[in-house]
Amino acid sequence: MLYDTAQDALRLVVLDPARMTFTSCGETTEAPSFLTVDEGITGAYWGELAGQPMPEDMAALRAYADRLEAKYDVDILLSDQCAGPCAASWEDITTTDQAGLEDEVAAIYPALEALDRTLALYPDGFFTQFRNARGEGGVQFLPVSEFHMSFEVIGMSFENGDWHCIAYQVSNERLETLLCHEIWHATEDKLISENWNAIDSWTWSACNPRGFDYYYDYDDAMNEAGGSWLYFGAAEDVYFVDAYSTMNPREDRARIMEYIMGAEDEADALAQHPVIRRKLEIMAAAVRAGFDTAGWGITRWEQPLTVQDRAA
């Protein structure tokens, strides 16, 4: 096999040494090796978190997902791979291969870019700690087309054996905040599975208005929650991010983490409200108690707690 530099091609040549003549050559010109590694390829793989060329097909998209898996120690399923875990959720979820999308790769790719940007917000080794003692399971992401439920859903977190599954709608415009919301649900599930009282219910309830009880119903929460307690309701005394936060304690906490982690323009302002700040402190302490945090430093969700109260 010879490399023809003039034609930039490989040629298969059969030689009979008995019919060849040999002469010595004093000077030679070094030909570029066809085995030379193009280091620009690694830049395309490991460069910016967004803005890389669109994968040409599902195989290239799978390769991108594989790189994210290795980078963050998570599991990512695509297209029809999501069907099994989605069935385990006992909810009606349409996977992207069943959605009749004009270009399935183009629909999923931005959702993987958003996932890359989101996972980069968490400390190194964070997601590894979701695995069991044998190193099995962990966090599994399922980019899907849509959910068919009794109320509007754009993402959900559920457990499937040793997996903390996070299904999320690829067409949503606020994927980073959505993912931060669902990652908190998975985090809370991990904490409570190891310590049922990881977040003390009495301590949490003490943060809320006197006599308040969560609605535990989507329609009631969205229709009846008073704006006088809501951050997105022009309240003076803020207890909750928005009406959805009043549905139950889990959604209250996930909504806080959604905006603290995924909405940088709101995080500091939200954490300046004493009750929200106290709730965030409770959540941060639970994570510190339930994870090996050696080498973490100040996490993104703890950063707003370091900002001095501007009202002081």
Identify what each model region corresponds to.
Residues 134-312:
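Active-site-flanking segments in enzyme catalytic domains
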Residues 68, 115-130, 183, 187, ...:
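Hydrophobic, Leu/Ile/Phe/Ala-enriched alpha-helical segments that form helix-helix packing faces
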Residues 12-14, 20-23, 78, 86, ...:
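Auxiliary, metal-adjacent structural segments of Zn-dependent hydrolase domains
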Residues 5, 21-23, 28-29, 36, ...:
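Residue-identity detector for threonine
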